[in-house]
């Protein structure tokens, strides 16, 4: 349990957030598949990324880590058969991306995860991998971990996804890297494109036309130096905290600003947020900059479904901004939130309601009437890191103490979150 009290002062000064989780995962995987050595700076050290690292080591990949510096000794796409089950723990990225890799090898890989991950749907990845030629045996009519994959000679396919998903797209591109012929993925909206950018950075040739991306099989990857920017999803908690705590003026340094990730900035600015981008530049193929955020009175907003993929991880913290905004805000087209680490729609509705927020559940989103007094009480993260951090930020504006059960879930992506929040709000 973690106790949060109202912020004693505005959030001021500068803060640096840990390395991007999505890019850290992909740097490990592409480095393992490449020829030569890949060096990763500012690697995110958290439960999810370490799950990927541990799985790769079970494939026989040699990896050296010294704090946030990682050296991966590439295998030139020659993994060894794992002698043990591959445990993705709570990480959907680990499970889905490595499924695409596993489908290319002529041996059996057995995957599992924690109780939460074993409830998350996998058919959206496993079915297309089967169409490419992999053999898959999965629990729950082919939809859930644990599952086994025996790969081999894959055939390139053209896939049209019903829902935009960076994890599904990435798994299919990684499988296509070793398939015969070309593999293409077309999405209804553009999801985050770190995999495409990084494949190019590692020497692969891909074609990108609008919502379609295509990769040809048989390509080699070459080890690279990857400098991981700060994680925008992690920065979002401090962005919203600075917007809602009076007298705040915060600069968040070196944040990844990939346009497929920053839908939250668009929505917050529509709500009246005072956010400026400073020192904009590119690093390892990714746009990066500093964010200057000042306290801002916010007004309600309706989030259009087409922007959902560009902010899929930020809805819990957006809900905090909506709770403090004037008027009625609405989110639609976000049913994907129901199959995250928790059912995030239900988690937002149940826990925010306890704190006095007027929130209504929709099948694919929620409605929040902002402006109610926020009340400190006991709430539950539902073992979801983003729910835990969002409740903590909401607690900064609450009357009384907010007690968060299962707050240790933050270790999944940001183990030092509460220490950093305390420094910013109490001047420690």
UniProtKB/Swiss-Prot annotation:
Protein's pathway: Metabolic intermediate biosynthesis; chorismate biosynthesis; chorismate from D-erythrose 4-phosphate and phosphoenolpyruvate: step 6/7
The GO molecular function terms of this record are: 3-phosphoshikimate 1-carboxyvinyltransferase activity
Active-site residues annotated for this sequence: 313
- Write out the entry's keywords from A to Z: Amino-acid biosynthesis, Aromatic amino acid biosynthesis, Cytoplasm, Transferase
A GO CC term attached to the entry: cytoplasm
Q: Which GO terms describe its biological process?
A: amino acid biosynthetic process; aromatic amino acid family biosynthetic process; chorismate biosynthetic process
Please list the residues that bind phosphoenolpyruvate.
Answer: 21, 92, 120, 167, 344, 386
> Which InterPro entries would you find in this protein's record?
Enolpyruvate_Tfrase_dom, Enolpyruvate_Tfrase_sf, EPSP_synthase, EPSP_synthase_CS, RNA3'P_cycl/enolpyr_Trfase_a/b
EC code: 2.5.1.19
The entry marks the following residues as binding 3-phosphoshikimate, namely: 21-22, 26, 165, 167, 313, 340
Q: Which SUPFAM superfamilies match?
A: EPT/RTPC-like
The keyword Hydrolase appears for this protein: no
| UniProt main location, coarse | cytoplasm
User: In which compartments does the protein localize?
Assistant: Cytoplasm
Q: Which reaction does it catalyse?
A: 3-phosphoshikimate + phosphoenolpyruvate = 5-O-(1-carboxyvinyl)-3-phosphoshikimate + phosphate
What's this protein's function?
A: Catalyzes the transfer of the enolpyruvyl moiety of phosphoenolpyruvate (PEP) to the 5-hydroxyl of shikimate-3-phosphate (S3P) to produce enolpyruvyl shikimate-3-phosphate and inorganic phosphate.
Q: NCBIfam families from the xrefs? A: aroA
What HAMAP family does UniProt report for this protein, alphabetically? EPSP_synth
Name the family the entry cites: Belongs to the EPSP synthase family.
Subunit note: Monomer.
**What protein is this chain from?**
3-phosphoshikimate 1-carboxyvinyltransferase
Q: Which organism is it from?
A: Carboxydothermus hydrogenoformans (strain ATCC BAA-161 / DSM 6008 / Z-2901)
By which gene is this protein encoded? aroA
